[in-house]
Amino acid sequence: MTLLRLSLAALLATLTACGSTGTLCGCDDSCGATLTCPETTTPTGPTCPADPDDGAVTADCGIWASATLGDDGNPGTQAAPVRTLQRAVDLAAGGNVYACAETYFDPVTVPAGVSISGGWFCQGGWHRTDKRASLAPAHDVVPLRIVAGGGVSILSDLVIRAADASDPGGSSIAALADVGAAAEFRRVDLTAGNGADGAPGANGGVQPATAGASGAAGFGACSADIGMGGLAPSVQCDDGPSIGGVGGDGSANAAQAGGDGYPDLGAGVGGKGEAAAPVCTGGTNGADGDDGPDGVGALAGGTLTASGFVGVSGADGSPGTRAQGGGGGGASYGKPSCGILPHGGAGGGSGGAGGCGGRAGLGGQGGGASIALVSRSSAVVLRDVRLTAGNGGRGGNGGAGQAGGNGGLPGTGGASYASQPPVGAGCDGGFGGHGGLGGSAGGGAGGPSAAVAHVFGAAPAQDGVEATVGAAGAGGLGGNPGDVAGAGKAGQAVADLEL
């Protein structure tokens, strides 16, 4: 009971207004005597349903939107509706949106708890109609996103269409319920367009990799006190330098061996100088680099993200390795028979540097998906809903590996001197090895066509759902046509896709 404390003036005014009975208006004799009245309850307004099928909707039940009559500067009343559904959702602040059965071209993000009813006629007054509002924005966007919020969104009498994807590997998804969202779809058509083909992977290179530098010639006999061997050539590759072996130096006192090629791959040995053999010997050829392994094709599948779907790309190839430089040639001894000329021997030619390894091809991109509804750990109920998916995109082809660079030519040994006895020539260096072939890449997986795609264990509850799917995308070819393992797998065409 609530005690009414009235001033004398107020009491007299009340008595006067009530006549001369001496009792308060609205009170019986007993409460009038004690100046107390029972506590009253203010009547509440009408219940405002999110779905008009659940009860009567009045003008003050929510925010009203019309693509043709509205303006986003309006308050969102029936007399002054807003133009876009996003503005209506923002103004609703957890309440209801009632949309005229027209086409809306802007995507909308709905916090769970905001509801949208799309079955309204608005030309000359608002009333229910058997037509539905359509949401059909441009390509490469998800028309409807539902994110976590403070309640459950009721989405009724809507037609939602996603356009064909145009970005490489892009997906066409009509609606996406993100992590933590809760929503119920009633009398809704969700239609996805076609997923886009994945982009091909880049080739390692059109031209072969950098060739090894050629070796240098040694000094001729009797041209200097020390006939210098050819200097070591070098080339810088992605995985380090390849260097030809230096040519041996020749003098009256020594005939040096040539240097070994770098990196040490078991070949490219420097030739012997004349002191260690009846005559000098040439350097041996450098070892070739290793070919890079090819990348494998992508398996079918993909990942559901806040942006939609990411397909599986093929594996990149591995680069070829640099080759070894050739060994340097050995030198000859100098002799007094050079006469008045310097008594140096002939220097050996240096080995050619090895060629660089080819760069790898890059994996083909996965094809885009066509999915009517994506559910990412969300609570979704479908009632009287039609789900239609288009075709998945083809996986991109893998890139081809780059050919390895040719090995450098060997330097020639220094010339002999025709004297008696003659001074012998220096020996040639070895050829640089050939760089390894870059590995080719795998093709991307084909994109799926699915009515519903969801994470493990989070399938929507369904009642009266009609699902139609298109064709799955084919897998992309590998960059090496002869490698069967390089082809990507085809996508899946299923009503329910669990990822």
Q: For the regions a protein language model found, what residue spans apply to each?
A:
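C-terminal motif of bacterial Sec signal peptides marking the signal peptidase cleavage site
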Residues: 15-17
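Bacterial signal peptide processing site
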Residues: 19-22, 28
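Right-handed parallel beta-helix/beta-solenoid
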Residues: 31-87
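The right-handed parallel beta-helix/beta-solenoid scaffold, focusing on the short coil/turn
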Residues: 61, 95, 106, 112-114, ...
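N-terminal extracellular ligand-recognition/capping segment immediately after the signal peptide
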Residues: 85-86, 93-127, 139-140, 389
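Right-handed parallel beta-helix
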Residues: 113, 118, 152-162, 182-194, ...
